[in-house]
Amino acid sequence: MAKAKLVNSPSVVGGVDTHKDLHVAAVVDQNNRVLGSEFFATTRQGYRQMLAWMASFGTVERIGIECTGSYGAGLLRYLQSAEIEVLEVTAPDKMERRKRGKSDTIDAESAAHAAFSRIRTVTPKTRSGMIEALRVLKVCRKTAVAARRIALQMIQMNIVSAPDELRDQIRHLTRMQLIRTLAAWRPDVTAYRNVQDAYRIALKSLARRYLELHDEIADLDVMITSIVDELAPELIRRKAVGYECASQLLITAGDNPQRLTSESGFAALCGVSPVPVSSGKTNRHRLNRGGDRAANSALHIIAIGRLRTDTKTQEYVAKRVAEGHSKMEALRCLKRYISREVYTLLRNQNRQINSTQITT
């Protein structure tokens, strides 16, 4: 579908407040005046109707959308396929909200105003490539790991409170021996009113759940490893960079890392860029507590790994400490350097992938 454009028509900018079942759209003209607002269903037909409605006011130059990673993901993909420029609207205008209050229509108009002025907006992730697939698999793995941990905790708690004769049979086993032994039990399921049989039934159920989740995690690890190897082979070869950290950094950068215009922007996204807090004669910086904390954690793990095994990293931290910095301050500087290294690798790899696709 080509970009919505009418001959000799005025330019308009759209804004969308996204929800689960209905999106609220608004349109502003070349002077940032509201032309109208409307509700649309969160279906492909609804997306088509929304774009046609916006185009009825003029040429749609761009559209600002809230929550492109959740409720607005489907609309984002549709508009990108229609070659419409999309901006993600971040935080609402607090001053405007205090004056006008809050409603879905007001939020849609605010998104349109933000897109018109290009304030409180960022370039959204495309969410249509392999990194989006990686993100979905990683989220699935994370929940499976959490569920497996809970299953193991419940097994251990039940064993602690189980009858002595039952507990004595399994207390000497290692973790996997215990899990496989419990999963192989054949309790009498008709005797569930008996305490000991009820414990056997519960422990067998928990053990089988643990093993199923264990196999599920192993399958997901194979898929995640394959994607990371394909997307970031150079990154995974760097010291102390494992698949868990590499996958998280890829997800943070997104399928279109070119939206990050500088390595300092990537550092800010990862929360490793120092924030200036200077005033008058005071000139200092503080720790950045914003950004993607999962990416920050990945950089921290890489830094700790290099600090333990890499001689150059150890020398760098020792030099910083000798200059009067604390070890934690030296570690923050190290994370900043690692983010620069990661940014360069991801940008170069993205250029290589794009070049290969164009050649093909």
What is each residue range found by the language model?
Residues 322-360:
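Basic, amphipathic alpha-helical segments enriched in Lys/Arg and hydrophobic/aromatic residues
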Residues 236-237, 243-327, 355, 360:
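Phosphate-backbone recognition surface of nucleic-acid-processing proteins
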Residues 5-29, 111, 144, 248:
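Gly/Thr-rich phosphate-binding beta-strand-loop-beta motif of the actin/hexokinase/Hsp70
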Residues 45-62:
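Short, basic/hydrophobic alpha-helical segments
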Residues 80, 86-124, 132, 136, ...:
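Short alpha-helix plus adjacent loop in nuclease-associated cores
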Residues 59-71:
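Short glycine-rich phosphate-binding loop at a beta-alpha junction
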Residues 22-45:
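Short glycine-rich, Thr/Ser-proximal phosphate-binding strand/loop in the N-terminal lobe
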Residues 139-234:
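Glycine-rich, often acidic, oxyanion-interacting loops/wings at catalytic, nucleic-acid
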